[in-house]
A protein has these predicted regions:
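Short, acidic, small-residue-rich periplasmic hinge/interaction motif at the N-terminus
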Residues: 13-16, 21-29, 51-60, 67-111, ...
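Extracytoplasmic beta-strand/coil segments of soluble accessory domains associated
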Residues: 43-45, 119-161, 177-178, 188-208
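Outer-membrane beta-barrel transmembrane strands
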Residues: 313-331, 338-340, 436-483
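Short, small-residue-biased leader/transition segments that mark boundaries at the very start
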Residues: 1-15
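A beta-strand signature from Gram-negative outer-membrane beta-barrel systems
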Residues: 73, 125-127, 173-215, 312, ...
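Periplasmic plug
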Residues: 97, 141-185, 211, 217, ...
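Surface-exposed loop/interface segments of Gram-negative outer-membrane beta-barrel transport/assembly proteins
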Residues: 96, 208-303, 344-349, 355-453, ...
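Short, acidic Ser/Thr/Gly-rich low-complexity loop/linker segments typical of extracellular
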Residues: 31-41
Length: 501
């Protein structure tokens, strides 16, 4: 039969010599096999010299040669969990000794996804953790651990190399060795009320024992968006036909401030004007402008604009990293320098980040005292004024702006001091702003952030398995914004005069 002969490594003797029902026995090189019964016994037809492969969940698989008619096989409890070390708030523990809900994500899993932040890379890699991406370059993802716990702030606490912080921004994902996600209430015993929404413990890379390792890594790629939305937008003629039929089946005489309607519902005739005239303009000469005290609004030539394709383009993404690390029995060090750049598929928008990280530690006093530090400096720059948190953002404008309207008025690109953009100040054209004009005018906006994050620590070994550690951490963030509000005379609800910085 098969019995468990050893439960060493701290598990105790409670399972010693207990039968293992349901274990699998196979003859190597064949499909012949069987399983053990409730008492751990089995019968299998095998020849002398055959090798049996014996396996059981949680135990080390063993190969046993057939010698004689009777075999008693002992399996040792697998030590897989014992070899997994998890970083928690108090320090490190064997995974099998942890009673709380902890999920570990290794660096290889994170780096399989090229992303701006490690919170974006976490998506789909930890049960009970929900990630909602910002969808803008440099935007931080919204992380929720086991749902919402309050109507207020539900963000988890981040602990980066021992420094608690509320923001994972500016952290280079390539610097991360592993992540531990503490999901249950036990985290509050370490970090208090700050851990009410869970804790994400980030451990950065350290030097490995051996000779100095120097490496350079880079990648280049690009992001694309579909040429059309899932449901392609109507062109100018299709929209005109739709408006004609909408009026007709509503019991009204089809009419529109721009289109000309004739024909029948079965064969509607839609005429598109040569020019779109602003409300109040004389439709006499294409060079005429409508003048009011606070607005100058140009006549525009009718178009058939696909606004989605106008606002999007292929966007490159680039990453460069230099890394040097090394260690011996007494000390270790690791240094990285990284540059990351990402353009948005939405035109005139981008993000770039530069980071430097250094950590080192050394043992003194006959290895009874360890001294070390972790330092990170980063500077990131968000370019352009696109945001997706308002009704009037450019992407929503792409499907609300009328296809009759071109990007520019009859003066053309740069034809006047305000860009020469066309607008919707005309009958039945809505009040939406020109989304391309908005992105173009905001392309010089900047949001820069400098961050210094790190700590210094000392750890004393008092006795075997007893240590005391103290650390001093800091997280300093400085921000600088450039926000230019330029005139937008073509916008129905815009103000022609106001300019601010």
């Amino acid at each position: 039969g098969i019995r468990d002969s050893s439960t060493s490594r701290g598990l105790g003797d409670v399972y010693k010599r207990q039968p293992l029902p349901g274990a699998t026995i196979l003859i190597v090189g064949t499909n012949n096999g069987t399983t053990t019964d409730f008492d751990g016994n089995f019968t299998i037809e095998a020849s002398q010299g055959d090798v049996l492969v014996v396996s059981f969940v949680g135990y080390t698989t063993q190969e046993v040669p057939v010698e004689g008619d009777q075999l008693t096989i002992s399996l040792a409890l697998g030590n897989l969990l014992e070899e997994v070390i998890v970083t928690t708030g108090y320090g490190t523990q064997s995974k099998r000794d942890i009673t709380g809900a902890v999920t570990t994500v290794e660096a290889d899993e994170l780096l399989s996804v090229p992303a701006t932040t490690f919170s974006q890379q976490l998506q789909g890699r930890a049960a009970g953790v929900t990630i909602t991406n910002d969808a803008t370059p440099g935007g931080e993802a919204t992380v929720r651990i086991r749902g919402f716990g309050t109507i207020g702030n539900n963000d988890p606490l981040y602990v980066i190399d021992g420094v608690p912080t509320t923001s994972p921004g500016n952290i280079n994902p390539n610097d991360i060795e592993s992540l531990q996600i503490l999901k249950d209430a036990s985290a509050a015993s370490i970090y208090g009320a700050r851990a009410a929404n869970g804790v994400i413990v980030v451990t950065t890379k350290r030097g490995k024992v051996g000779s100095t390792q120097v490496s350079y890594n880079a990648y280049y790629g690009w992001q694309n968006v579909p040429n059309d939305l899932n449901t392609p937008a109507m062109n100018a003629a299709e929209l005109g036909e739709y408006l004609y039929l909408a009026d007709y089946y509503a019991g009204k005489t089809p009419s529109h401030g721009q289109y000309g309607f004739s024909g029948t519902p079965e064969n509607p005739q839609i005429s598109i004007p040569n020019y779109v005239f602003p409300s109040g303009a004389n439709s006499v000469d294409e060079s005429l402008y409508s003048l009011t005290p606070d607005n100058i609004y140009a006549i525009t030539r009718s178009a058939d604009t696909n606004w989605w394709q106008t606002l999007t383009a292929q966007a490159p993404i680039t990453n460069h990293q230099i890394q040097a690390s090394g260690a011996n029995e007494k000390s270790q060090y690791a240094f990285t320098a990284n540059y990351f750049s990402q353009d948005s598929p939405v035109v005139f928008v981008g993000y770039e980040r530069a980071t430097i990280r250094l950590n080192s530690s050394t043992k003194v006093l006959n290895d009874r005292l360890t001294l070390g530090e972790n330092f990170s400096l980063s500077l990131d720059n968000r370019k352009g004024g696109y945001g997706n948190n308002s009704e009037q953002n450019a992407v929503s404008g792409s499907y609300k702006h009328h296809p009759l309207l071109p990007v520019y008025d009859i003066s053309g690109p740069g034809g006047n001091p305000y860009g020469g953009f066309s607008g919707s100040r005309g009958l039945n054209l809505g009040n939406n702003f020109n989304p391309y004009a908005s992105l173009s005018r905001n392309q010089d906006d900047r949001s820069k952030r400098f961050r210094a994050l790190g700590n210094v620590f000392a750890e004393a070994r008092i006795a075997d398995k007893v240590t005391a550690k103290t650390s001093f951490g800091f997280d300093v963030v400085g921000r600088r914004y450039l926000d230019i509000n330029r005139p937008q005379p073509e916008y129905v609800e815009g103000n022609f005069i106001t300019v601010s910085y």
